[in-house]
Amino acid sequence: MMTKEELHKQLKELGLKKRMKILVHVSLSKIGYVDNGPDSLISVMKEIISDDGIIVMPAYNSYGEYKPNLSIVNEIFKNQCDTIRTNHVIASFAVWGNEKEKIGVNIEYTEEGLSFEAGERSPLAKLYDNNGWSLMIGTDYSTCTILHLAENRANWP
């Protein structure tokens, strides 16, 4: 079992620090049992980053009851009172931190139509443009949504 203190130490050793802006992808089941589970992980990230930083997690498109195939960490994070959620129909994000509105932009309807979830006006673009980082815990790059921004900027088909 990993304690909250051990988790704090490991995330600091990994390079997490105050004021960072991070996009988090996590599979808690892949790292083993954590004392107090998702709540510990979320609170440790908030302690380290501080509210001067920003934490972003995919909120998926579940607007109703919890769906077990989605991350419980993301589910708990997006429902916390100090977290905002973007309003994209299929690719929303949950955002926390003092400047969450800077990253947590909502979709826009323009003459071109609905803004792309990884387009230039997306939370991913805002995070990247503000020196954001990607934190992968128990996952690999196949789950890293920031890559969609890279594909978009590279005009990948």
Go through each PLM region and give its residues.
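N-terminal and secondary-structure boundary signal
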Residues: M1-P157
